[in-house]
């Protein structure tokens, strides 16, 4: 099968680098999508479920563990010349950890804002919202930051297996209504469960469409 026809989520992904500051960013090339969310929103678990690899993104019970931009790409590309992966997933540091020192929070904010504002290959940020708690104040702050940076973002509800199934459509509608007037928000809200696998194909398809890849299965 030609490289361009490889299914996006049908073969292994690998971690390629952690980025503690902008000087460590890989050269701009393939399209990128980033995942953002509060500490312990289930970000690493969702990325692992998305690509079907339990140990790809590190999961931790310690909030605020991820302090770098972590890059993941489909395996099988050398990265040399034109042999580049079709896209990259960027796992952003979790925010909103109450015990994080102010210096750490300030560093996170600067790294993230500089990345968001200056990365031409970034096509969309998926902002994860815990379905049990809804949009919190620190989520609102991040959405405002994304609006100011003029970066397209889409909200994704996580852990929907933790709430009653009939409540999910109502929560989706309420969440969509809350972001309706935000200039950079994509209007459709997605719902997922890493535990049960619910909504993962919808998210895979959304990512593939965002980066312009037809063959994602």
UniProtKB/Swiss-Prot annotation:
<feature type="binding site">
    <location>
        <begin position="192"/>
        <end position="194"/>
    </location>
    <ligand>
        <name>GTP</name>
    </ligand>
</feature>
<keyword id="KW-0717">Septation</keyword>
<keyword id="KW-0547">Nucleotide-binding</keyword>
<feature type="binding site">
    <location>
        <begin position="37"/>
        <end position="44"/>
    </location>
    <ligand>
        <name>GTP</name>
    </ligand>
</feature>
<feature type="binding site">
    <location>
        <begin position="64"/>
        <end position="68"/>
    </location>
    <ligand>
        <name>GTP</name>
    </ligand>
</feature>
<dbReference type="Pfam" id="PF01926">
    <property type="entry name" value="MMR_HSR1"/>
</dbReference>
<dbReference type="GO" id="GO:0046872">
    <property type="term" value="F:metal ion binding"/>
</dbReference>
<keyword id="KW-0131">Cell cycle</keyword>
<protein>
    <recommendedName>
        <fullName>Probable GTP-binding protein EngB</fullName>
    </recommendedName>
</protein>
<comment type="similarity">
    <text>Belongs to the TRAFAC class TrmE-Era-EngA-EngB-Septin-like GTPase superfamily. EngB GTPase family.</text>
</comment>
<feature type="binding site">
    <location>
        <begin position="91"/>
        <end position="94"/>
    </location>
    <ligand>
        <name>GTP</name>
    </ligand>
</feature>
<feature type="binding site">
    <location>
        <position position="66"/>
    </location>
    <ligand>
        <name>Mg(2+)</name>
    </ligand>
</feature>
<dbReference type="InterPro" id="IPR006073">
    <property type="entry name" value="GTP-bd"/>
</dbReference>
<feature type="binding site">
    <location>
        <position position="44"/>
    </location>
    <ligand>
        <name>Mg(2+)</name>
    </ligand>
</feature>
<dbReference type="GO" id="GO:0000917">
    <property type="term" value="P:division septum assembly"/>
</dbReference>
<feature type="domain" description="EngB-type G">
    <location>
        <begin position="29"/>
        <end position="213"/>
    </location>
</feature>
<keyword id="KW-0460">Magnesium</keyword>
<dbReference type="GO" id="GO:0005829">
    <property type="term" value="C:cytosol"/>
</dbReference>
<dbReference type="InterPro" id="IPR027417">
    <property type="entry name" value="P-loop_NTPase"/>
</dbReference>
<keyword id="KW-0342">GTP-binding</keyword>
<comment type="function">
    <text>Necessary for normal cell division and for the maintenance of normal septation.</text>
</comment>
<dbReference type="InterPro" id="IPR030393">
    <property type="entry name" value="G_ENGB_dom"/>
</dbReference>
<keyword id="KW-0132">Cell division</keyword>
<feature type="binding site">
    <location>
        <begin position="158"/>
        <end position="161"/>
    </location>
    <ligand>
        <name>GTP</name>
    </ligand>
</feature>
<dbReference type="InterPro" id="IPR019987">
    <property type="entry name" value="GTP-bd_ribosome_bio_YsxC"/>
</dbReference>
<dbReference type="GO" id="GO:0005525">
    <property type="term" value="F:GTP binding"/>
</dbReference>
<keyword id="KW-0479">Metal-binding</keyword>
